[in-house]
């Protein structure tokens, strides 16, 4: 009211000038208000607006109060979010900005030291688990098993590093099953794998090791029916083996499914799981599982990302490094062959003839090369099957099963088959296309010479591959011996037939491609996270 009177006095002074005491007496509040309304009306201000001006102070106070409350709420939410991020921030972006791991928090074990145990009986495992181990003919533990399992049984987080084919799966499955035997809790462990094939094989290992203790397991991967998987999850399996995208789909959409009581998290082939395609799904998974859990990271190689991941998600982990960063098996014979690009298919067919009857994996760089090369081999009478990311899940499993059962002795694959797959007794690996990085080379040739067997790898090097090949030699620390090429007259005679077969293979590949795409493309989604080839 005082403020309004001051405004009226100012307006009145403009009209009447200086007010005398007598005039002041005449201008009672009622008269003043009447004069004020007349003045305001002349300026286009209504009585209703005057009333709103009177309430201006109280409105401002209310707005300020609401603003303060909102600010306090926002600060509280921000504080909660910061706390949550501190506990769960395990995304790729956070890993890239975090500092490197300090060596004081990790115990690196000398791989040349004497094994901690030489038989599984020394571990005091439960009888049911020992029975399964014996039925699987596991007589002597591998180095990674000997070093990792004792620490895992003590409840420690593990970073396990070992060359492919060294028994990593059993190294984390045995401690989990030992703990499960005492708890018998549903949704006890989650194992994340980068590819569908690896997920199925991990499940097979768990099923075999847990066969005597009533283990329930489930494999949740893309390319399979969501409803069938949801029903499987409602049966409350003890162990879930999954690809990140599909398990996240179920966490978001399958009613009644939760991992809030999860005890074990395993990331197999951890470096690949940390690739960009898996980042968003991994971030969400790590936010919905308990902070208090046991975590195992297993990989064939060590990367900076894994070093940083242990700082973000593991508690006082033990690093079990059984092999160096880049190492091939001692019983693997590696060689290379310099070839003219125009004769590459001819050389390949010559090698397939040379190793007739042996189990062979031919690695290519792209899906198109894998499909075309498999067709080329089939046209020329070889039992070859393709394996790549653009096949349906049933087709991929079909190719794998044919190769593993010796119905087909040649598997033509992209790098989707290079890591983690349990393919026993591969005699020869042929790098039709040399890989673009050294790690991929290690994983490819690691498909042979497994579990103490001998093996052979041959890389076909064209004039366009020399730079990549020299990088691989630099990492290996040695030069690969050159493989002798067949005589020119033999190659020329074979080249005529291979050329015709190649043309037919290209035609059939185009037909398959057109049929698969149906004249159009398709959008990539989380279920395709393990389809890394183009």
From Swiss-Prot:
Residues 149-320 form the Helicase ATP-binding domain. GO terms for molecular function: ATP binding; ATP hydrolysis activity; RNA binding; RNA helicase activity. Residues 347-492 form the Helicase C-terminal domain. Residues 68-80, 91-107 have a biased composition (Low complexity). It catalyses: ATP + H2O = ADP + phosphate + H(+). It comes from the Eukaryota. GO terms for cellular component: nucleolus; nucleus; small-subunit processome. Belongs to the DEAD box helicase family. DDX47/RRP3 subfamily. This is ATP-dependent rRNA helicase RRP3. It comes from Candida albicans (strain SC5314 / ATCC MYA-2876) (Yeast). The gene is RRP3.
